[in-house]
Amino acid sequence: DDKPYVVYGYAKIPETKTLVIDPGTRVHFHANSGLIVSENAHLQVNGDLSNTELLENEVIFEGDRLEPNYADVAGQWGAVWFLPGSNGNNIKNLTIKNATVGMLVSNNDGTPTPTIDMMNVQIYNCANVGILARTGNMTGKNVVINNCGQASLACTYGGSYDFTHCTFANFWGSQNQYCLIMSNNNINDSPTNLTNTNFKNCIFYGSTNFGIGLEKFSGTLDYKFNNCLIKFVDTYNQFATNPLYTFSDTSKYVGCIIATNTTTNIP
């Protein structure tokens, strides 16, 4: 079936069920609509590499306004929402466009197995956050996120993350956007540990001075950047004594290039 799917409201994958999305599928979400993955439910996106500019094998999630004026308008629909206990989600060759939040991840399933495993995923033009993970457990390879109103990737309330060969850009155009936010803060409870979080051969670069924003409360904030490009233009040395940004600390930053101005080390 070559026809696209149009979703009104939030479609929900029931518990213990798996939604399998075949290569080339197009899903259009109406305003205030999205996809919910229930506890013990699974999302399997089987997109594949394409041979033409038509992206014939790519899976695409976007809004239902197809006029050219809406091609890059953020916030046209809601989110792909992974509820607590959702697990074993495998996502390949998926593009998400013009959502409010591309992926919302609410807690992992409490096991060492990643809640979400992604490869060749692209997320563009989200009104708030590309991936908002709250105590998530995620892995990603060849992930690209760009142009988000708050952050491209937000790893909040701790969790565990592993990203390789990824680009977290943000050229939203105003002053308060980040490519990456990481925090172990939990507003309502004690801080939640962020453990075993790794970024390997990744880019964090955008139109604002700071590509990353890190926040540590009591508890653990365990992260490492390996061979990454990070934009961090601290013109007034406001973070000079903050240990989270000690780029010479090889327990946190190994082989990284730090873009300390806007004219050198541009990707």
Q: What feature does the model see in each segment?
A:
Residues D1-P267:
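Beta-strand/loop edge motif enriched in small/polar residues
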